[in-house]
């Protein structure tokens, strides 16, 4: 069972909470963590952006990953939302098994 941390940026904590709750309640993610007040700097449509955003981190497995990404895209208001998956290469086996159990593996 391969587990992942999914890093997602959102416009604010309200959107992060909405998406995170959906992911957990629909068993696409075992849990979600939200960090408020992140500063993001980037170029979008040839304009420099310096924005305040929130970060949503979800934990899931390979089996649920594709559906999780699609669910976030459907609920996100950004045209091109940041949704990246990072494999968990090691960790507490009990916690990793809990993740798998929560998402139905």
Positions of predicted regions on the chain:
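Positively charged, small/polar-rich N-terminal and surface patches that mediate targeting and assembly
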Residues: 1-105
């Amino acid at each position: 069972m391969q587990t992942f941390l999914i890093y997602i940026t959102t416009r604010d904590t309200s959107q992060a909470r909405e998406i995170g709750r959906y992911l957990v309640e629909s068993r696409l993610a075992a849990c979600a963590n939200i960090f408020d007040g992140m500063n993001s700097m980037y170029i979008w449509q040839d304009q420099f952006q310096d924005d305040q955003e929130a970060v949503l981190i979800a934990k899931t497995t390979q089996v649920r990953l594709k559906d999780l990404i699609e669910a976030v895209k459907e609920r996100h208001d950004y045209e091109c939302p940041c949704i990246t998956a990072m494999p968990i290469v090691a960790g507490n086996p009990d916690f990793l098994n809990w993740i798998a159990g929560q998402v139905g593996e």
